[in-house]
Amino acid sequence: MSSLPTPLPPYKWTLLTAGNANVVYKSDETDLLLRLRRNRNAPSTAEVDEYLTGTIRPAIGPFLFHYTVVNLPLGFLESLPEAENLDLGEPLGLLMENLGPKPNETNVLKSHAVKINYSDNWESYTVELKPKWLLQSPTAPKDSINCRTCALQLKREKPRICPLKLFNEDEQTSLQALEDVFPGTQKQFEPLAKFFSNSELFAEIRHMQHGDELGILGYANYVQVPPQFVTAMTMRDVSLFVHVQGDSVNGKIVDADLKSVSEKRDYWASLETDLIEGGWYEKPGTNCLLRN
């Protein structure tokens, strides 16, 4: 535990969103959000805190979302909306900053798994997306024309911006990737493209993803996968919020939880096998950087 848990303020909470592992609540009495554990097989809140403070924060520092571990009062979980979806045995929660759009950002663009809330005249905007795989899969075929993310989106018929383009070290490549999906926004997205190309955050994400040297199929005979692989998988599934106001850009990472290898290992291996045997790495139909 990074520090002793603090008491949860006595606010009235309503459901904001529910994922596979966690449920998030909001309150009109605070700008903070309350994240609670849903899946009993997922790491506990204490384990999540230990992983974030011991592994993730030392690597990405100020780019990790701010949170406080809080004690949950007896009977509190049962009193919440959607209580049946919660792990009622979990004694802790995370009180976290709200990285969502600002009140004046009432306009919305959404495409290719990118959501943008923006104010009138684009005075400010908030971008939400998952960076995904910033490096190719270690087990991808040598003649691949699709990166791991593009291969999967082709298989699932759910288009994404190629992350090798979006987070490219060349600003123009990043800017063009945004312009291709959101035409007519080049001027507005110049600060965002500069951040995607130059921020040390994405260099560190690449470094952490590079800790997976063999790929999930390469660890088939391992009783336990190394911790570097688990961290690589975590960093392939984080969410990113970026707030832009003028030339000021502030980005934060969330959903950087420790992955449950016992639950995910077979799924990861099966998915990679499907991508390879189905020829998805070599099929045309994407706008992947590797095709150029």
Swiss-Prot record:
Pfam families: Ins_P5_2-kin (PF06090). Signal peptide: none annotated. GO terms for molecular function: ATP binding; inositol-1,3,4,5,6-pentakisphosphate 2-kinase activity. GO terms for biological process: inositol phosphate biosynthetic process. Transmembrane segments: none annotated. It is found in: Nucleus. It catalyses: 1D-myo-inositol 1,3,4,5,6-pentakisphosphate + ATP = 1D-myo-inositol hexakisphosphate + ADP + H(+). Belongs to the IPK1 type 1 family. A motif (EXKPK motif) lies at residues 128-132. It is an enzyme of class 2 (transferase). This is Inositol-pentakisphosphate 2-kinase. Keywords: ATP-binding, Kinase, Nucleotide-binding, Nucleus, Transferase. Has kinase activity and phosphorylates inositol-1,3,4,5,6-pentakisphosphate (Ins(1,3,4,5,6)P5) to produce 1,2,3,4,5,6-hexakisphosphate (InsP6), also known as phytate. The lineage of its organism: Eukaryota, Fungi, Dikarya, Ascomycota, Saccharomycotina. Its EC number is 2.7.1.158. One of its GO terms (cellular component) is nucleus. The EXKPK motif is conserved in inositol-pentakisphosphate 2-kinases of both family 1 and 2.
